[in-house]
């Protein structure tokens, strides 16, 4: 597999924190954080549904901690910005229902101690088994300083800016829901220019589309985007339907785990299918994907490749990965097989070791439930560290 040649377009999207699916992710991760703050070894799989006037929180949670979930939900909804009935949703008056069960004992017996050491007392904390089967992907490339693909990086920055100008009063007529999309023109695998930007921003009913278009270009797009990437052929579609008043959970039902491509690489890399939010780190859907990003980013930061995708796969109840694959699309300084060997020598990808090395039993998850889990220079995220660069270069002999 090599880099694509010639000229082509690639598009990624993001959504604001007020999008109903992202509201669900933030609520699920807020519940997770609140529990981990009191019980770091809790087992949490928290799912959220939002619709007009109602939030439903369900899932499997095993913990000795008590968390007031209804009040927590209301705090999250109000913090996002749904504070008035005229927005179609109000955190102070919406209904909140909870339906929580404990984790299945059949799953727990495989996670508590992996099959490799079941019946033994040997490095027990490191030898917890994977919480499920599955494959996860991590990716990094040199298109941005944070080693992320440019389309998703810009889409996230635009979405965050859209929320910022709403919250700080720069554009007071904006409401919480919104989406962004960026199309980049590439040539021989390198980004050259922005072809198209799409922004849909929920707004008050008495604001004209002309005003919204002008303000979004001036205060959102031009504040975020490198003007060297814009030319006279760049197209802007601002609220292209002509009106976006009804939004949030009133406009669409929100569900945890419905924005997995927004959460990762914007479709630029492959995805194993597992969502992140609401899951404690024994769930390899989350910790495995974070570790794969950590590995891929260190390979690129070490100068061993310009693009790197890492696949890791697990069996439920088994600690060691069943497979590790490194793909560098023809940009690697070493063969992909050799890089995979370096990964096995340098990184311990057992779930317990990932949890230890990345210190994942902490309440750090709600902050990444909107605007991306990866490539966040605004946050100090352990899976974004490039702490294995020197060791990788030494082992690679460069």
UniProtKB/Swiss-Prot annotation:
Mg(2+) binds at residue 21. L-methionine binds at residues 60, 103, 252, 283. It catalyses: L-methionine + ATP + H2O = S-adenosyl-L-methionine + phosphate + diphosphate. Its cofactor is Mg(2+); K(+). It is an enzyme of class 2 (transferase). Its EC number is 2.5.1.6. Gene3D superfamilies: 3.30.300.10. Pfam families: S-AdoMet_synt_C, S-AdoMet_synt_M, S-AdoMet_synt_N. Catalyzes the formation of S-adenosylmethionine (AdoMet) from methionine and ATP. The overall synthetic reaction is composed of two sequential steps, AdoMet formation and the subsequent tripolyphosphate hydrolysis which occurs prior to release of AdoMet from the enzyme. This is S-adenosylmethionine synthase. It comes from Symbiobacterium thermophilum (strain DSM 24528 / JCM 14929 / IAM 14863 / T). The lineage of its organism: Bacteria, Bacillati, Bacillota, Clostridia, Eubacteriales.
